[in-house]
């Protein structure tokens, strides 16, 4: 029976390593997260202006993300959007934690247990009204606003920044907000 313990510990160790690898959070090459980042100013409701499309947001418009502080110091993430094909609202509740320090806009977000993805605020205006957010890699990008629209000069600034990092901004989906 003692011979089974090393195998059990090995299996547990491999499992922990696998979860850490799957939950790997990173930032696209050349990108840097906002620092200093003011968490309290970032909390609240954001409207999605544009995104790189992926399966969890397919066919959604009127997308919002609302961030609120939880008692344990993590951030509650409440994403909502209207599926215009199925004619129904979709909601996803998750949590976000800071990767390093809370004064740096590098977070990891999870909607599925121990599995995290990168959420990197790489640009935000001084009033925290507009934000450019990168995921783990060049497949994930969001332009956010506190309002349902964004000024053209901010939009162009964020597009230039994304392109300088290697994003193909021609593939952005411009989210309908009505």
Name these PLM-found stretches.
Residues 2-178:
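A beta-rich soluble binding module of mature secreted/lumenal proteins
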